[in-house]
Swiss-Prot record:
<dbReference type="Pfam" id="PF03477">
    <property type="entry name" value="ATP-cone"/>
</dbReference>
<keyword id="KW-0863">Zinc-finger</keyword>
<keyword id="KW-0804">Transcription</keyword>
<keyword id="KW-0678">Repressor</keyword>
<keyword id="KW-0479">Metal-binding</keyword>
<dbReference type="InterPro" id="IPR055173">
    <property type="entry name" value="NrdR-like_N"/>
</dbReference>
<dbReference type="InterPro" id="IPR005144">
    <property type="entry name" value="ATP-cone_dom"/>
</dbReference>
<feature type="zinc finger region">
    <location>
        <begin position="3"/>
        <end position="34"/>
    </location>
</feature>
<dbReference type="GO" id="GO:0008270">
    <property type="term" value="F:zinc ion binding"/>
</dbReference>
<dbReference type="GO" id="GO:0045892">
    <property type="term" value="P:negative regulation of DNA-templated transcription"/>
</dbReference>
<comment type="function">
    <text>Negatively regulates transcription of bacterial ribonucleotide reductase nrd genes and operons by binding to NrdR-boxes.</text>
</comment>
<keyword id="KW-0067">ATP-binding</keyword>
<dbReference type="GO" id="GO:0003677">
    <property type="term" value="F:DNA binding"/>
</dbReference>
<keyword id="KW-0805">Transcription regulation</keyword>
<keyword id="KW-0238">DNA-binding</keyword>
<feature type="domain" description="ATP-cone">
    <location>
        <begin position="49"/>
        <end position="139"/>
    </location>
</feature>
<keyword id="KW-0862">Zinc</keyword>
Amino acid sequence: MRCPFCGNADTQVVDSRVSEEGDTIRRRRRCLSCDKRFTTYERVELAMPSVVKRDGSRTEYDAGKVRGSLSLALRKRPVSTDEVDSAVARIEETLLASGMREVPSEQIGELVMGELKRLDKVAYVRYASVYKSFEDIGEFVEAIREMQGPLLPGKKLRKD
């Protein structure tokens, strides 16, 4: 590590501490030439995978697009911004944990649907209708049935 004061490359680590979150190491260093001390921080830098679109083109992952998709589906629904941010973070953690360098956009769409299913069932059906390109009312009905899960014995769906 170069000294920020004199530019000398010979420095010595005097003290190292892990942050409370456990994701950063703080190091106190001393320059062996000018004897001045300085602090450095070390943390893992993880790269999000590239996104492979349906047409085969590739683009950088954009958390803003994921957040926008979630927010649009959740528009006028009782879900807080913090819950949306947490959903985006879970999607990103899943993508990073996969270790993949490239991920199909369809996989991100499925992750978004999973988060919406957990957050708000109406928003899930909204998103699914666009994402899966519903063509008729039957596809909406099927998505709603999927959300309701198995019927209890003796219960029937109303056909109104």
